[in-house]
């Protein structure tokens, strides 16, 4: 299977906080090294999983700089830098590029529900403002509107640095159409861990993963198995970790993931409002899966 420039196993990295709610630089560097040691190809700070809606612009730049410093020469860094104001999104993209990001992940404008022409002009403005590659992030469940396949293809054909799309629509018909019609340069990345196998089986280029925060080597192995057309291995990994993939969304992302990472001793379990800790019932379900997979000891969930 062909490997495009932005392909493979990418992690949507969490942002660790201290108890005073400031960014925990030591823990962030630890997380980046955990990813590098386990073969992650692309590290994505300041996305949805990184709690970007509750980070200030200054904090986003701080996080991106730390990640770029720690990952330099070892993994690509595609920084989350999107918002629903085109002017602001351009400012964020420029700041991310200046901070050292090798690519930009830009979420579709949310809440204001632009037309398809509005989506096009939004991304055109961003792409023309920076020189690094752009990953379009289509996530209708969060934004309230869907970027059509025609629009994504138009953007990729017209703009030299639009090189990938993170497809988190969950719509396999739409993803299939995109894979069948895309220009050669465009990488199509699954935005949902449970869909890594089917999307890559259809010709997709990898995953921007939530679960890679917890099990980076597992996600990497699944992606590599699909690149190698080793469906037997891929199915085994997919089936073994499918429950974890889905339990990561038992409550708002990234709460289950940060809960897990705290149990693993990698971060403190701290969120910024309006995100709150898991309910007792959700903890019990997630704990059982974490113990079964050997990610934590049973004593750690007592």
From Swiss-Prot:
Pyruvate binds at residues 49, 208. The active site is at 137 (proton donor/acceptor), 166 (schiff-base intermediate with substrate). InterPro entries: Aldolase_TIM (IPR013785), DapA (IPR005263), DapA-like (IPR002220), Schiff_base-form_aldolases_AS (IPR020625). Its main location: cytoplasm. The keyword Lyase applies. One of its GO terms (molecular function) is 4-hydroxy-tetrahydrodipicolinate synthase activity. Pathway: Amino-acid biosynthesis; L-lysine biosynthesis via DAP pathway; (S)-tetrahydrodipicolinate from L-aspartate: step 3/4. It is found in: Cytoplasm. The keyword Secreted does not apply. SMART domains: DHDPS. The record marks 48, 111 as: Part of a proton relay during catalysis. It catalyses: L-aspartate 4-semialdehyde + pyruvate = (2S,4S)-4-hydroxy-2,3,4,5-tetrahydrodipicolinate + H2O + H(+). Its EC number is 4.3.3.7. GO terms for biological process: diaminopimelate biosynthetic process; lysine biosynthetic process via diaminopimelate. It holds the Pfam family DHDPS. NCBIfam families: dapA. Catalyzes the condensation of (S)-aspartate-beta-semialdehyde [(S)-ASA] and pyruvate to 4-hydroxy-tetrahydrodipicolinate (HTPA). Belongs to the DapA family. This is 4-hydroxy-tetrahydrodipicolinate synthase.
